[in-house]
Amino acid sequence: MPQVKIIAKNFMDMVASLPAIKLDKLYNNVFICEAILRSLPPLAKKYVLQMLYIDVPVPATMMEEWVLADGTSKHRVAIDRLIQLRIFSEISDRKRGTSYSLNPTFQNNLQKHIISGGVLPREPMNSDNAIKLPSLQELETYALKQWECFLLQLINSGQGEKLTGISSSMMKIFQRGLLSQRDKDGPRLTESGFQFLLMDTNAQLWYIIREYILNAEERDVDPADLISFLLELSFHVTGQAYNLNTLTEVQNNTLKDLADLGLVKLQQGRKDSWFIPTKLATNLSVSLADSSARKEGFVVMETNFRMYAYSTSKLQCEILRLFARIEYQLPNLIACAITKESLYNAFDNGITSDQIITFLQQNSHPRCADRVPSIPENVTDQIRLWETDLQRIEMTQAHFYDEFPSKDVFEAACDFAREWRGLLWEDSKRMRLVVKSEVHNQMREFLHTQSR
């Protein structure tokens, strides 16, 4: 089954995939250089800092002496990463061998950053000029609510309802793979869309941001400029207000889209307008593997396939409905059951057993999460068995042949099909056989020659 593929796990993977010209342009921004330095593997970071004030190429043999004998593989990974990001330039010389030098722009900006001690991309507004700002708890609640509303829009649109309050930029992201629309029917969730809903929040967020960046040129926005601005956001202080007048028109439009996702909160006073970054925005440059601590789960799974979800979230209820039968819903409790029919419906929509099991494990209630396994083994085994039930039959396009003039012609046709690895089935008594469609033309020519 097709899967939602996150090609780049974080911003740095996407930065590395940029053309050389755009990558060099990014390094004109001090904050990009700092963000990339933070993201590097420990050994790669060590190499950059050691070479920061060396203006001549460093021989590869000398760098190999900087690591222990058992660190060869880590050394190679670090060098490859630095070359991939164009931080290192590899210089080959027949006499002197291979050497490496730092990207001069990257080097100069890091030197300036170390000397100046680091300056914020833009200063927060004075508290006198802004109205009462939300607390960090209120801001986190707002971000969660916005993100859940965003995902509910995706689910509702998949059920035939129109998208409301979603910008055209975000609508295009939905249409790039999460939603499909036929001529007469309304939009429907694709297999990737169903799988997307079972991802954890960090994976979902990065998928949306990645598509937003890839879609940038269609909005006449330079992807390098967009990446630069998004990475700058990660250096802002969560909960502080920043004046919108300091931003370009493109950056203002970007913030409106990010507000849909809950990455920023937009506010307006009598004179000024400002944005307030949430924790989602300041964590943008963090990789999926290093993302925030595991959130508290809410699902209790029993051995009898009944499931209890302690949640008041409409979104969580709709996600559970993707693979379970909702039996009743109380203000803070959703009672449901995993059945063969509910799972078959999930499998038909492209969701896999592993995705369902991973979702249940990641969202296990704290009292269940500590036990091993957190989900009863009979439940996980049965989910996988029901999936294999649908995989027992493999569909292959084929052609059926009968009414052979003689036994010899039939046997010759069988041998010919075997040679071409196209024989699927044969009945010697009735002289019938089935071959793959790929060899149909060859089989037809062969039978034509046999009839002469």
Curated annotation (Swiss-Prot):
Gene3D superfamilies: 3.30.70.2610. It is found in: Nucleus. GO terms for molecular function: ATPase activator activity. The keyword Transcription applies. Belongs to the TFB2 family. Component of the general transcription and DNA repair factor IIH (TFIIH) core complex, which is involved in general and transcription-coupled nucleotide excision repair (NER) of damaged DNA and, when complexed to CAK, in RNA transcription by RNA polymerase II. In NER, TFIIH acts by opening DNA around the lesion to allow the excision of the damaged oligonucleotide and its replacement by a new DNA fragment. In transcription, TFIIH has an essential role in transcription initiation. This is General transcription and DNA repair factor IIH subunit TFB2.
